[in-house]
Amino acid sequence: MTRRRELNMKLIVAAMLSVMCLVFTGCARGACGGEFEDIQWKLNSYGTPGSLQSVQGNANITLNFESKEKQINGSGGCNSYFGSYSIISNCELRITGLGATERACLDAALMQQEQNYFNILRDAESLQVEGEELHISGSSGVLVFTR
């Protein structure tokens, strides 16, 4: 009987440790459909749901989530940018302190594309990883990135 009780206690402790692990890792890595931090993401398309447009020209628009400092950075196509992020329950994304260098693009269309990107990123409300894609959405639109 003592041996059985000991086995039950071990199972209970293992179950409790598993639950604690899930609770403490919550919506960080992997809970939003997959890993998104410490990966360089490249923007493929942006816009409103059902009306996405591809990135214009040879613009290299990127996004990095730095997990240790909870910072974002990347290229908007013309300018480098930076900010802070937090993940709240259910993969809610909050981006704060978004700033960028102030170089002008020679191409007005690329400058407008960058401004649209920054507006959508600034108003981001959620993120989801779907396979090799990262989807960020909010009140201003949707951003679709690939690894």
Model-derived regions, located:
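Intrinsically disordered, low-complexity regions enriched in serine, threonine, proline
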Residues: 1-2, 26
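Positively charged n-region of N-terminal signal peptides that target proteins for export
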Residues: 2-12
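Hydrophobic alpha-helical segments
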Residues: 11-15, 71
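Bacterial N-terminal signal peptides
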Residues: 14-23
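Lipid interaction determinants
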Residues: 22-147
